[in-house]
Amino acid sequence: MDDDVDAGEIYAVDRQREEGSASAAAFSRSPSTGRVDDDDDDLLTYGRSARRMAALPAPAMPEGTELRRPVGGDVVGDDDYLRFLYKFKELFDRVGIKLPTIEVRYKNLNVEAESYVGSRGLPTILNTYANILKGLANTLHMTTRSKQKISVLHNASGIIKPHRMTLLLGSPGSGKTSLLLALAGTLPSTVKVSGMITYNGHTMDKFIPQRSAAYVSQHDLHMAELTVRETINFSAKCQGVGHHYDLFLELLRREEEENITPDPETDIYLKAATTGEEKAEIVTNHILKILRLDICADTIVGDNMLRGISGGQKRCLDAHTAPNVDSAAEMLVTLGRALFMDEISNGLDSSTTFQIVNTIQQTIHVLGGTAVIALLQPAPETYELFDDIILLSDGQVVYSGPRDHVLEFFKSLGFKCLERIGVADFLQEVTSRKDQKQYWIHGDDTYRYIPVTVIAEAFQCFHVGQAIRSELAIPFDNSKSHIAALKTSKHGVNLKKILKANIDREILLLKRKSFLYIFNALQLTLVAIIAMSVFIHTNMHHDSIENGRMYMGVQFFGTLAIMFKGLAEMGAALANLPVFFKQRDLLFYPAWTYSLPSWIIKTPISFLNTIIWVSITYYVIGFDPNIERCFRQFLVLFVMSEAICGLFRFIAALTRHPVVASTVSEFCILIVMVSSGFILSRDEVKKWLIWEYWTSPLMYALNALAVNEFLSPSWNEALPGFREPLGRLVLESRGVFPEAKWYWIGLGALLGYVLLFNILYTICLSILTLLKRNVREMSQETLQIKLENLTGYDQEPSSGGRVTNDKRYTEGGNNDEATSSNANHNSSPARKGSILPFVPVYMTFEDIRYSIDMPKALKVQGMAGSRLELLKDLSGSFRPGVLTALMGISGAGKTTLLDVLAGRKTSGHIHGNITVSGYPKKQETFSRVSGYCEQNDIHSPNLTVYESLMFSAWLRLPAEIDSMARKRFIDEFMELVELFPLKDALVGLLGLSGLSTEQRKRLTIAVELVANPSIIFMDEPTSGLDARAAAIVMRTVRNIVDMGRTVVCTIHQPSIDIFESFDELFLMKRGGEAIYVGPLGQHSCELIKYFESIEGVRKIKHGYNPSTWMLEVTCTLQEQITGVNFTQVYKNSELYRRNKNLIKELSTPHDGSSDLLFPTKYSQTFVIQCLACLWKQRLSYWRNPPYIAVNFFFTVVIALLFGTMFWGVGRKRQSQQALLSAMGSMYSTCFTLGVQNSSSVQPVVNIERTVFYRERASHMYSPLPYALGQVVVELPYIFLQTLIYGVIVYSMMGYEWTCTKFFWYMFFMYFTLSYFTFYGMMAAGLTPNYTMSSIVSTTFYAIWHLFSGFLIPKTRIPIWWRWYYWICPVAWTINGLVTSQFGDVDDKFDNGVRVSDFVESYFGYNLDLLWVAAMAVVSFAILFAILFGFSLKLFNFQKR
């Protein structure tokens, strides 16, 4: 048995399996446990049978005993699984119980959406504001709608019957996903739906569609920190047998009545499906084995930044964490479940796809399930597993019926599938205008394009279409619907168990993220120590009102420090929202069972943070020593922390966007801070804004803290000339209610806010949906092609931007010219691209080994060694003009090998020799001549397709290539991969907006091709593409190879034609070992000859796909059956020796050759890199309304709010308190706007950073030009923000209108916002994710607050901390603002002191040193910008 571990996987060694009597013995020895729901009514109704079920023994089998392994197992094969299914069904048949089934009907189903067409759909700042105004005008019926209606599905009709597998085919964009969503009842409310959909004759309002059907999305959404086992286990715990319990109960009752002895194997399985806590574990293990995920069960799922399982394994995981499919009971005993699965084969090899589909097919056929599965490139053997076909094209159903009649239908239209072309490929191409002609059987002279609408109409006249129409006319007999088929309850498990599952997961996530919380606590400890030493009790006395205000300042600072620490909660909440919305919509759980654990489980963190703060600061600073008052302070701060965390969670759920959430959160911090009663006392708040004071949680916290402290015995002494105690005077001077009851009022209000914010959080989670564009903006070219395919006529855009029919060809006309030109276009080589020179290179690698540090999970399991080896002694060569396929089952290590060879690994240990053209590989030069198409399509979301290609070509093509040649080169490859219709389409974020999956894949390929590389690595270039698009891509790749380039591709599901377009094959098996490296030969003859010569390997069938056969005969199961170690067979072969000789020959430089050498490190100069990066950032920012537009909106709101709250404060100079209020306005405004800029820019940096990692690995540019581009693009937006804010606030606050004072105000605000923005960039650059950057930055926000000069003047800062005052950027901002506005004012206060003298004596500000403050703020902006650049240069947080 092979104990090795795959790339990205942790291998869980399979336990020995026992059968028959061992299973029965395990059952008899298992302890007793309760069933899912203990219902006394069942006991009364069913008597002894119910008691048997109520005390079902949990099938907790001893080690070495498991449920039978279904298809794809290491021991038990397809026949065993099928036998098990028949045996299971026999349980019900022999007692006369009919299993529930579902028949889905849809009639005249139409789905329409509205979308902007062309540039109007780009999310620019102007378009965003225009859309808002347009929406308001539409609401008031002042204007007409400018969106264009798009028909997604048109008059779709059909019947999906039980016991039959239905394959949904269609090119991307044809409406497959919309049809599946409509049938599953999960279409978004933003689209218009008409027509009828019924389940067993019942409309969807009569049952719960999400519980009666399961939709599996094509996008992988999982919590990256959880392991595969934990992900499936959670899914299993949230699902249940539900109504099927009664069905099983009836089965047992009838068995007892008829004295039938249960079969041990099926009886164990039945009990596993109906027991309580043990069910999830058994179900999880079963699913892991069904999907071949047991080898990576204890590996975290991972994401783009966190290394985890492979892409194919994620697809398997996604396919079986959908509701109703995730438990073994529901997978094997579908019992009336309707499955709708969307492109589940993406990233899977053809063998794994076949095994999974075969498992589903056997289940559907035997147990009467209903399934519709959309596949893009099904292999012929996978295609044969289906009974029915639904073929969509441009929203039209062109065929829906038995698979046996589909070729007959198209033959009646004059089309025939060609030899060696898969039927599925033929069906997807025959409706395409560019591919239809090749299948015409009556000669080219008679051909004219038959549009989609004509084919759809012809199907209605075909006998299959007529039969469906006739059957739909007869209503379904509702009496035939099984009572257990359609679910009327929302959840399959009682809410108590669902809540427990969420609590367990939340605790698990808390442990996985413990470093973040520990780091957060350590930083709070640091801030507390600093505050303690600044406000040390030896400098803090209880002898004056001024010192009393200092103590209130400490309390204010403490609340701010704890409040800023709560910001980390928002980042964590945002990160989990996509997974939450997916699981909520699929009815895994109600929102409250998610929100309650996320609140309660985090409570100890708030408790710990509060203890840290109070224990460090309380007694050292000199608060009242009474232990009760210490506890009271702790209680207020703890409850306030809980309220603030609830507020930030609520903001995250409300905004659902990291950038918008950051902006809104800072706005809320501003409101609660300014309205707290500290910056402006209650007496100074305007009457019309007093509501803000009464609604601020911070006000209640400060009131409670102040009353607790200043009504204590420590403040009971009266000052000379006053009768009232000093503490009472302090409270009255700041407008605090001097009554003891206000402690309890404040605490009660905070508790109310805790409940309010968490209730609002739950409500938002319950009613809102994930922010995404349900209908992507459509380019005019795309809409034009869609209409041309539908009608057969050329389309012309009207003057208003709408595409209208232009009948350039009559119905009887011949459009051979257009069609033939398209056909020629598709097959033409890259003639224009070939004019660009390149240096052919070849690569050899010998004895490559790659290992990582042993994961903790495996150490716990007892695996020895300090490292885990993922690649083992791999050797091979890639040569110019040779197209090499790198293949193996999912998780074999293909991507890992590509990463190692391309130099993309950022961690782990690599051993072995790699040469390029005979010389040792140097990564810097190799990156210049290589391209890497990554499996994850990572692009800048706010660029268009053409701009993305332009940026890549601009920075990667040699500097001597002029712009016109570069443009021609780009256009050539856009034509080759058919991106011209998408030229002006926005790339967007995967799964949320912009391009579809297959469009992004083509863009990924084009981005690398336009760099004109000599050697290209392609990781699954055809994954996510339909057969036609895959053929286009591979045709393009073949053309590139024929030019003399070296290309190696990992590929999963090649058709025969695509597979045989490769020249050589590098085949790997699990464990990272090679089992075949050599030529394919004509019709794969060399490959077939090699494997058929091995004893025990079955012969390939005639017409069978060699790639599928190859994976089948070399799988782990076959190795165990035949006893053949394919790795050892290869190493003992003559082929291996020939390869070693070839590697030895190619590893030596040829005579007259020279090593790769470039005069410069990058293709373009530093200046060009800066210009290109600035060009890209300018476009990205202009199309980023959540960042720019929202920022401007809140800037205006904050300016008006502050101007109102501090109205005329600049003219009030009659008292020191008035000046302090003016200073408070400056302090709060610069901090609020600054922190808003700093926080909102961090998600922007993080989103683009994944793209930056890819581009830097390609040596497109140095990190410094990238950083400079992002810094410079901010400057005009900051200037506009400063201008908007400055003009509003300066005039409303009544500062003196002189050119000098206004200039200095704008100057300091501009550079303050600049250094805050650049600080946010730097924080993001120095940390791995948004949550961590929030923790780091908020720590410095708190310290800057402390040393800003407002809470404690410079003159009163202890000498040992005064040095930090000089390096605190905010201190220089406050210095500059106060000095420029009041440093030259000769007016006197009521006590006779001049304003300028007070500014100098109290604050230590000197007008003569104003230029120093100006230089300081400029220096900080430059410093943070430089540090941002170096953070990108020095740190790489991508784990690969």
Curated annotation (Swiss-Prot):
Pfam family for this entry, one: ABC2_membrane
GO MF entries: ABC-type transporter activity; ATP binding; ATP hydrolysis activity
Biased composition (Low complexity): 21-32
CDD domains referenced in this protein's UniProt entry, alphabetically: ABCG_PDR_domain2
Positions of region (Disordered): 1-42, 794-829
Alphabetized UniProt keyword annotations: ATP-binding, Membrane, Nucleotide-binding, Repeat, Transmembrane, Transmembrane helix, Transport
Transmembrane regions: 516-536, 561-581, 603-623, 634-654, 659-679, 688-708, 745-765, 1188-1208, 1219-1236, 1271-1291, 1302-1322, 1332-1352, 1357-1377, 1410-1430
Predominant subcellular localization, coarse grouping: membrane
Domain ABC transmembrane type-2 intervals: 497-710, 1168-1382
Biased composition (Polar residues): 812-829
Ranges where the ABC transporter domain occurs: 137-419, 843-1095
Subcellular location per the Swiss-Prot or TrEMBL entry: Membrane
A GO cellular-component term linked to this record: membrane
Source organism superkingdom: Eukaryota
Keyword Transport assigned: yes
Role: May be a general defense protein.
Name of the protein in question: ABC transporter G family member 46
Biological source species: Oryza sativa subsp. japonica (Rice)
